[in-house]
Amino acid sequence: MAIRVTVWNENRHEKTDERVRKVYPEGIHGALASILQSQGMEVKTATLDEPEHGLTDAVLENTDVLVWWGHLAHNEVSDVVVEKVYQRVLDGMGLIVLHSAHFSKIFRKLMGTSCDLKWREIGEKERLWVVEPGHPIVEGIGEYIELPQTEMYGERFDIPAPDTLVFISWFAGGVKSIRILILFKYMFY
């Protein structure tokens, strides 16, 4: 049976920034969905402006993994929807948060912390080191992945200690690395 994934995106940049719209004509959620579908996953998308933000009870009940992309509209997410997602995660649904979703209501509720971290945007190189090479999520990856130009997210990242640390990252501009992929007992991998 295929993994059932729902990709959620606030879908704000695509509506307000022509450059983003050109890169992601189907939205960031559409680009992510396409990649996951190419890997044999059953994928649907949901966005902030849909009723219930596209995360109805039926959608959540038929989701094994929820991918959450957020950046600037965290406070627009309904507390009712956050509570539904929270309960589904506690019941076993996986959650993967991307980009600035570390400040999303759902991630902060799950972590029980501020989820604050250091950040800068100077277009520097990042190297993501695999620190748990036997973990299934890094199957087929060498010692590291290198991104030639990215934003820096750095420690201290105010989250609880993870059950498993799979990647740490290093940035060309200095500053401490950040724990990139953290897996807690209720997160999917």
Model region roles, listed by residue range:
Residues 2-15:
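Short beta-strand segments enriched in small/hydrophobic residues
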Residues 13-17, 175-176:
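Short, solvent-exposed loop/turn elements at domain surfaces
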Residues 17-20, 108-110, 179:
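Short aromatic-enriched loop/helix-cap "lid" or pocket-rim segments at secondary-structure transitions
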Residues 21, 25-104:
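Helical hinge/lid and interdomain linker segments adjacent to catalytic or ligand-binding clefts
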Residues 73-143:
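A glycine-rich, often tryptophan-bearing local segment used as a flexible ligand/cofactor-contacting loop or short
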